[in-house]
Curated annotation (Swiss-Prot):
Residue stretches in coiled coil: 883-953
Function (record text): Catalyzes the attachment of valine to tRNA(Val). As ValRS can inadvertently accommodate and process structurally similar amino acids such as threonine, to avoid such errors, it has a 'posttransfer' editing activity that hydrolyzes mischarged Thr-tRNA(Val) in a tRNA-dependent manner.
EC numbers, comma separated: 6.1.1.9
Disulfide bonds: none
Organism: Pasteurella multocida (strain Pm70)
Entry protein name: Valine--tRNA ligase
Gene symbol of the encoding locus: valS
Length: 954
């Protein structure tokens, strides 16, 4: 008996979450087990950038990771969730540059390199602390003593080791090649950092005079060249036509005179040219266009760089051969008038000069995509610069084979094709960046320009026998952030040392990440890991066995979340709530585009007129889990969040009903389990099976569905109600059976739900465990429920499902006839099968209590029923006498609706059976089943029509 047990009326997340998490962390529950005989399970978190704070995408992916970690911990595995943060070179440097500009009016150059880097370390301490606190608030079960940062000493050593080894193997080299150059930030940037923006531009058609008296097929002494970038024409080193374009075949190998620069350049043939674009003649500028660069390499054209690193026109062209070395034998003068001009000013001047010379043929409007640096915010410039590169083709071959052979699985599988498409056409990777924040490239130069690569300067001098007085200067550049991120799964475990952790937890089991970084991070992790980490047999290790690819979290209108749109949702605001004023300040304060503030404020007030209420971490986690459909983008849904907050309350209230019920009897003695007790155990087992199967397939949404369906619809709405009459009127043995089942199923349900909703389940479990006779300090170290085939009870399921349909049918008759629950009804039954008859006899008392019936009677064969409202449950006819209750008009309308429904089903089956293709292909058993269904509907329709006629005659 539990008369003295107390439990709060409602669950208040803010009252328990942070205290519970502190207890978990201090108790060391998140740490891997020291029992190395246990199977290991590990996940390396995609390290968030230390640029600010976590967003909803982080919360989404981390919730899914934590579900897997908590599940495997409860399965008895030795679990490690390796966490940490990424230094995020360019992004973090820009954040701090903006900060000191806004607060101090200074630039990084005012500080100097060392002092500015100290400022970034200060920022990292602040931002990294914010991120780790947010992750705690999400309930992430992380061993915080293992938290790493991509510029930790150990990880920095790993970066140097990889660089030096790859250089020694000839896979890292320095060369002059074309890169995405940000002329504002003065650094090379990756393709990921380039945003192609739709733009209304122009297609200029210029006349390039043919040299040496050559003529076109139609007698012209010039070629018309179409270009969208006139400012680069001073760097042209050829014009190209398609080899099969008959208009120009006779000119291939001849030359044109490059206007303004007055030098001859060849006419070449290349398949790259689109005969339908413009005039079918294009200028080739290998130093200023990626496609032209490839054409130039194929034809061994010189590369004429006419721009400075500021994207101004140079005073003197830089001329590079196709081998990447300075070319002394080629001359390309830049006219004085363009020298020093900003690139777009030069564009206008060049167009004007072509027009003045009579060489501007026409200008056509042209829609094009202009590449912008996503952080600098200006058009990027393809630029020839000296950079460090990784020759990745040898690494890529092994990485492709790992996925082909199934060593690494992508979920959903379609993302394998994305991976293959990039990896099979992979280009050398530019790994150097002209920044101050990041891993400094471990290369040193003497005054003659000789390059020495080693782990540190002392090693350089020892390795090359350099005298102590020889001046050496370290390379100023830093490595691309993705270089160090690519080592994440093994560098965090102590590599290059062969540590016990590396042996125990590598390869990791799963990577959960977004599709947008498959190329830039996932692929590079696979390449680096398989090159550097081998098992005891020398076989390359994969970094992870599965890559689970998520979609993006978008706002409720399907828009991508961004600060400029003012639609970013902070996961902590969903957890703790936030008033409207604070939300407006968060969304419109310190904006880079303050002109958008008013628009954002209006949209925010419309979406959240009262601010955001507290929902708690569990409701947020359950919402994210329920929305996690495979691979698709997800529209955030506040109504779902509110619904799952109600779900938390439902679980709390159900637990409170069970634990504070003064009729609960857990005393020793004989026990009798009812059909309902057996049914709920069976249903619970099916839920365990559904959850486990869904999780094995990364169908997190189906895990949430299984939990919700069982908890709300089966346990709360049905089983609790079915136990109430037993606890009041049952025998002592029946009361014990119901009481034990309530406690047993509730305790197991808490364990089943724990990986998704850790806080509320821990809180309730501590109240339940004494009743359940369970010991332990925390639910997270309890065993996860197993599916038990023997606990399935088909008879109990069939009986309770029939009983539920009967109760629902009676309740529907009440609702449709406006009969209040306080008025007792009689129920007459006809045409019962033997199974129906047994279900009735076994559950008569429960049916009467649940449906609020005065009496239940089975009609004798041939016995006429009084005027009644009828419902069908399978073939059984349910009749509720309506004397004194019936609303004739409403009942006829209801029957008419039922008749139409049955007629529709009959018509649907008739159409199917009339379809010759269906009949020809369907197995005979399927056709027979359809005919049987149609006969059932016909019989039911006949009964409904009789009922209709009887009521109509009143």
């Amino acid at each position: 008996m539990t008369q003295n047990f107390e439990m709060a009326d409602r669950f208040t997340p803010s009252a328990v979450e942070q205290a519970l998490y502190k207890h978990w962390e201090e108790s060391g529950y998140f740490k891997p087990s020291e029992d190395t005989s246990k199977p290991s399970y590990s996940i390396a978190i995609p390290p968030p950038n230390v640029t600010g704070s976590l967003h909803m995408g982080h919360a989404f992916q981390q919730t899914l990771m934590d579900i897997l970690i908590r599940f495997n911990r409860m399965e008895g595995h030795n679990t490690l969730w390796q966490t940490g943060t990424d230094h995020a070179g360019i992004a973090t440097q820009m954040v701090v540059e903006r900060k000191i500009a806004a607060e101090e009016g200074k630039t990084r150059h005012d500080y100097g390199r060392e002092a500015f880097i100290d400022k970034i370390w200060d920022w990292k301490a602040y931002s990294g602390g914010t991120i780790s606190q947010q992750m705690r608030r999400l309930g992430n079960s992380i061993d915080w003593e293992r938290e790493r940062f991509t510029m930790d000493e150990g990880l920095s050593d790993a970066v140097k080791e990889v660089f030096v080894r790859l250089h020694e193997e000839g896979l890292i080299y320095r060369g002059k090649r074309l890169v995405n150059w940000d002329p504002k930030l003065h650094t090379a940037i990756s393709d990921l950092e380039v945003e192609n923006k739709e733009s209304k531009g122009s297609l200029w058609h210029f006349r390039y005079p043919l040299a040496n008296g050559a003529k076109t097929a139609d007698g012209k002494d010039y070629l018309v060249v179409a270009t969208t970038r006139p400012e680069t024409m001073l760097g042209d080193t050829a014009v190209a036509v398609h080899p099969e374009d008959e208009r120009y075949q006779s000119l291939i190998g001849k030359t044109v005179v490059l206007p303004l620069a007055n030098r001859e350049i060849p006419i070449i043939a290349d398949d790259y040219v689109d005969r339908e674009f413009g005039t079918g003649v294009v200028k080739i500028t290998p130093a200023h266009d990626f496609n032209d660069y490839e054409v130039g390499k194929r034809h061994q054209l010189p590369m004429v760089n006419v721009m400075t690193l500021n994207a101004d026109i140079r005073a003197e062209a830089e001329i590079i051969g196709s081998d990447g070395k300075i070319l002394e034998s080629y001359t390309a003068l830049i006219p004085t008038k363009y020298q020093g001009m900003e690139r777009f000013a030069a564009r206008k001047q060049i167009v004007a000069d072509f027009e003045e010379l009579g060489l501007l043929d026409e200008i056509k409007p042209h829609d094009l995509k202009v590449p912008y640096g996503d952080r600098g915010g200006v058009p990027i410039e393809p630029m020839l610069t000296d950079q460090w590169y990784v020759s990745v083709k040898p690494l890529a071959e092994v990485a492709v084979k790992a996925v082909e052979d199934g060593e690494i699985q992508f979920v959903p599988k379609q993302y394998e094709n994305l991976y293959f498409s990039w990896m099979r056409d992979i280009q050398d990777w530019c790994i150097s960046r002209q920044l101050w924040w990041g891993h400094r490239i471990p290369a040193w130069y003497d005054e003659q320009g000789n390059v020495y690569v080693a782990r540190d300067e002392a090693e350089v001098r020892a390795k090359h026998n350099l005298p102590a007085d020889l001046a050496l200067k370290q390379d100023e550049d830093v490595l691309d952030t993705w270089f160090s991120s690519g080592l994440w799964t093994f560098s965090t475990l102590g590599w290059p040392k062969q540590t016990p952790d590396l042996k125990m937890f590598h390869s990791t089991d799963v990577l959960i990440t977004g599709f947008d970084i498959i190329f830039f991070w996932v692929a590079r992790m696979i390449m680096f890991t398989m090159h550097f980490v081998k098992d005891e047999n020398g076989k390359p290790q994969v970094p992870f066995k599965t890559v689970y690819v998520t979609g993006l979290i978008r706002d409720e209108q399907g828009q991508k979340m961004s600060k400029s749109k003012g639609n970013v949702i902070d996961p902590l605001d969903m957890i703790d709530g936030i008033d409207l004023e604070s939300l407006l300040e968060k969304r419109t304060g310190n904006m880079m585009q303050p002109q958008l503030a008013e628009k954002i404020a209006k949209a925010t007030i419309k979406a959240f007129p009262e601010g955001i209420a507290e929902h708690g971490t569990d409701a947020l986690r359950f919402t994210l889990t329920a929305l996690a459909t495979n691979g698709r983008d997800i529209n955030w849904d506040m109504k779902r969040l509110e619904g799952y907050r109600n779900f938390c309350n439902k679980l709390w209230n159900a637990s409170r009903f069970v634990l504070t019920n003064d009729k609960l009897d857990l005393s020793e003695g004989s026990v009798e389990y009812s059909v309902a007790d057996r049914w709920i155990q069976s249903e619970f087992n099916r839920t365990v099976e559904a959850f486990r199967n869904a999780l094995a397939q990364f169908r997190f949404d189906l895990c949430a569905t299984a939990l919700y369906e069982f908890t709300w619809n089966q346990f709360c709405d049905w089983y609790l109600e079915l136990t109430k009459p037993v606890l009041v009127n049952g025998s002592v043995a029946q009361k014990r059976g119901a009481s034990q089942t309530l406690i047993n199923v509730l305790e197991k349900l808490l364990r089943l739900t724990h990986p998704v909703m850790p806080f509320i389940t821990e809180e309730i479990w501590h109240k339940v465990k004494a009743f359940a006779g369970v010991s332990g300090d925390t639910i997270m170290l309890q065993a996860f429920p197993q599916f038990e085939q023997s606990a399935l009870d088909y008879q109990a399921e069939a009986e309770i499902n029939w009983m539920k349909e009967v109760i629902v049918a009676v309740r529907n008759i009440r609702a449709e006839s406006n009969i209040p629950p306080s008025k007792g009804l009689d129920l007459l039954l006809r045409n019962l099968s033997e199974a129906d008859q047994n279900a009735l006899e076994n559950n008569r008392t429960l049916i009467q209590a649940m449906a609020k019936l005065d009496a239940i009677r089975v009609l004798e064969a041939g016995e006429d029923a009084p005027l009644s409202v009828a419902k069908l449950v399978n073939n059984a006819e349910l009749l509720v006498p309506m004397a004194g209750f019936i609303n004739k008009e409403a009942e006829l309308a209801r029957l008419n609706k039922e008749i139409e429904k049955y007629q529709g089903e009959i018509q649907r089956i008739e159409n199917k059976l009339a379809n010759e293709a269906f009949v020809a292909k369907a197995p005979p058993a399927v056709i027979e089943k359809e005919r049987a269904k149609m006969a059932e509907y016909a019989e039911g329709l006949n009964k409904l029509k009789q009922q209709y006629l009887a009521i109509e005659a009143l």
